[in-house]
């Protein structure tokens, strides 16, 4: 598959749809494209995010994702990296909203500036500069 054929879309299973939508729209600036009882689609730039309720998953069997599997730490071993044009403005916005930040804004050894936070469902996010 040619590399120019890809874009990113990711889906997260969440406990509280309203809380997750509020976080991604108010804190991270995603636009709600579609909202239904069992699914929401949001966009920021070329990044598409789907949200679905954990409660609608099967308890034990019925696919890779089940409620019993998601009772442990969600997103364990996964870091969702979101690139922004102005990481300083993004950091200030999150601070102004009063949302907890996992570490201060800092320039990393690899040359990018970033900060990290955890969404209401425990998914680990890194907000980073593009260059």
Segments predicted by a language model, with ranges:
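Short, surface-exposed ligand-recognition loops at beta-strand->loop->(often short) alpha-helix junctions
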Residues: 12-16
